[in-house]
């Protein structure tokens, strides 16, 4: 997804605003970018769900306890997460950050890390604010990372997947930015990067497809071809440049 492939990632989890059911998917996703050698969770241990306590033990996540003693201290865990992130950022030794939360309080943290030249991978539910999603280099909806089984009741009632055609305009616009006009070929890898650059939360899984290539093949007004073996390209068909043409 990105040209910068960090080798050592710091995973910071806002326990109060993250889903334990998605943690395995989060860790699997992070393997695409590097190693999550540092794994820290922040929250009130006494009020932390059994699912999170089990996940922290199983996934070697250090849970840092910040009790909610009064209304005035309800943000103690959030503040601790930010302090830990700044310590890691200025101490060096990490190549990127992953933040699990839906809290808009971390918007500035995300932009600050990116200003320092490091990528930020965000993870949160459908309801995560657009501001936080756009503050990340890449944002993944936790619902897209959960196994769709009865063993995970947290995903019951999840938002229905969008139809592949719902991604049409976004795909068309990205192709047009890379190659204005109709008929010009664009590499699928280049298109992938452009889609995420413009919309960090773009994910084929939101539209029911595992990969971008599968999503492209499901579009009506695109031509997809292989060149040479193992490399794919795509172009707009005549008439696809109109709104709703894909």
Please identify what each model-predicted range represents.
Residues 130-142, 147:
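Contiguous mid-protein beta-loop-alpha structural module that forms a pocket-lining wall or clamp
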Residues 110, 116-119:
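P-loop/Walker A NTP-binding module and the surrounding RecA-like catalytic core of P-loop NTPases
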Residues 48-53, 124-133:
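Short, glycine/polar-rich helix-capping loops at beta-to-alpha or helix-loop-helix junctions
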Residues 59, 116, 134-136:
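Short, structured coil segments at secondary-structure junctions
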Residues 1-90, 119:
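Domain-level signal for Mg2+-assisted phosphodiester chemistry and nucleotide/NA-binding surfaces
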Residues 118, 126, 151-246:
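N-terminal regulatory modules in eukaryotic regulatory proteins
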């Amino acid at each position: 997804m990105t040209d910068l492939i960090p080798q050592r990632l710091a995973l910071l989890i806002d326990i109060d605003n993250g889903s334990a059911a998605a943690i395995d998917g989060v860790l699997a996703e992070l393997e695409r970018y590097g190693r999550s050698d540092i794994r820290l969770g922040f929250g009130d241990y006494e009020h932390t769900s059994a699912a999170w306590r089990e996940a922290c033990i199983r996934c070697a996540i250090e849970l840092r306890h910040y009790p909610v003693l009064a209304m005035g201290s309800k943000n103690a865990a959030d503040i601790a997460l930010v302090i830990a992130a700044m310590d890691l950022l200025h101490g060096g030794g990490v190549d990127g950050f992953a933040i699990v939360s839906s809290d808009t309080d971390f918007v500035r943290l995300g932009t600050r890390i990116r200003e320092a030249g490091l990528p930020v991978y965000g993870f949160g539910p459908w309801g995560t604010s657009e501001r936080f999603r756009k503050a990340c280099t890449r944002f993944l909806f936790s619902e897209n990372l959960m196994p769709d089984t009865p063993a995970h009741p947290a995903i019951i009632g999840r938002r229905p997947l969008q139809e592949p055609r719902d991604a049409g305009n976004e795909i068309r616009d990205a192709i047009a930015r890379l190659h204005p006009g109709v008929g010009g070929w664009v590499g699928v890898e280049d298109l992938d990067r452009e889609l995420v650059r413009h919309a960090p939360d773009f994910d084929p899984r939101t539209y029911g497809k595992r990969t971008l290539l599968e999503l492209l093949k499901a579009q009506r007004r695109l031509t997809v071809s292989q060149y040479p073996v193992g490399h794919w390209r795509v172009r707009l068909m005549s008439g696809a440049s109109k709104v709703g043409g894909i």
